[in-house]
Amino acid sequence: MKISKKDALMWFRFFAELPEDEPLMPHQQELAWAVISQIEAAVDARHKELMAQIPDLHTLGGRTYFVGDPAKFSKGCTSCLTGTGLSAIRRTNKCNIRCPFCYNYGELDCQETIGEGLWEIVGTYFRVEDIDLLLSTSNRPTGVSYVYLEPFMEIELYPDIIRKFRAAGIHQHMYTNGTLCTEENLRALGEAGLDELRFNLGATSCADNVIQSIATAKKYIPTVAIETPMTPDFYEHFQQKKDVILATGLDFINCAELHLNPNNLPNYIGTPMYMTRRGYVSPIWSREITFRLMRQCAVEHWGIVVHDCSNHTKFARDLNLRAKEGGWFGASSYHSEFDQIPFEAFLPTLEDSDFRFLEEEPLPKGYRPGDIVL
């Protein structure tokens, strides 16, 4: 049904008042998902308009979009989207800063430890000396990534395992907020064989010392990039320091569409939201900022790749991964971070007078107020 925005707001205000443990009845569920669909359709149409304004927009088999030289597109992203996926390796359960967009916001001091001397790969625990066994018994991934939480809290532990995967010819990338980088530890990572280092520049609002570390990293590591959630705060600080940032010699910017979970959602209450394919919930402005940066890169000829790491991209990533694993046609682990629709989060979207649905129809009989047994 093409529910009107007025009716959508009325029903979502009602649903937001219901007790969390009270399930919606079937007709109510239809109404709820009709509203989510109407919002998503309007946002998708806006995205198409913005993409049409980007010169020389490239796609990776329809799985994602980027601007810049296709030959410079990240091998880590290529592995994620067309290879064996992200292949996350976890070790460090601590972080030295607190970011409002962090998925572990409010829980950083109680993250489960991996264990002394151990590395977690897809729920299995290994010592460095076990990696040879793993490589000899399993299908080799096209790439691996070091995640969770800030690896530079104990970066001295990483070179040994990096050397193992380097010797096996497997592409490796790592994420960092950049605040603990030094010439010495960056050199050690480069010498061990790290292929990509990605800086979350939004974590520090584009701090000068982190920008300098990007330049230093480029001396030792083949590919150096920015990967950060797209927020108005990041966009503002990036524009203020754009020339200095681009002068570091970085190779690409991975524009992550900010998606929310119960931990970080409270930091963005009041922001217009939408949901992608009944999965990730995101501020509407996040991917729009990505498109603004992509257009700016193309028009100003930055000479780097700017990549749209959106909810759509992550949807494609999981389809690719499940297919590579031999999953059923259509199988995916892409899903919402919420047990039920966070109705309150969508009220700002429905209350925004500038946000319009593409089509509207009167509610059919049986779905109007008073028709449904509540």
PLM region spans:
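Accessory C-terminal segments flanking Radical SAM cores
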Residues: 2-9, 14, 33-36, 305-374
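Core AdoMet radical
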Residues: 107-125, 138-154, 168-181, 192-209, ...
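Conserved C-terminal portion of the radical SAM core fold
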Residues: 211-317, 331-342
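Non-catalytic positions within long, well-ordered alpha-helices that form the structural scaffold/packing
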Residues: 136-137, 187-193, 246
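Surface-exposed amphipathic alpha-helices with a cationic face
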Residues: 103, 158-169, 190, 213-219, ...
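Distinct, well-ordered alpha-helical segments
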Residues: 155-163, 182-190, 209-213, 238-241, ...
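N-terminal [4Fe-4S]-dependent radical SAM core
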Residues: 6-91, 106-113
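Cysteine-centered iron-sulfur cluster-binding motifs in ferredoxin-type domains/subunits
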Residues: 90-100, 150
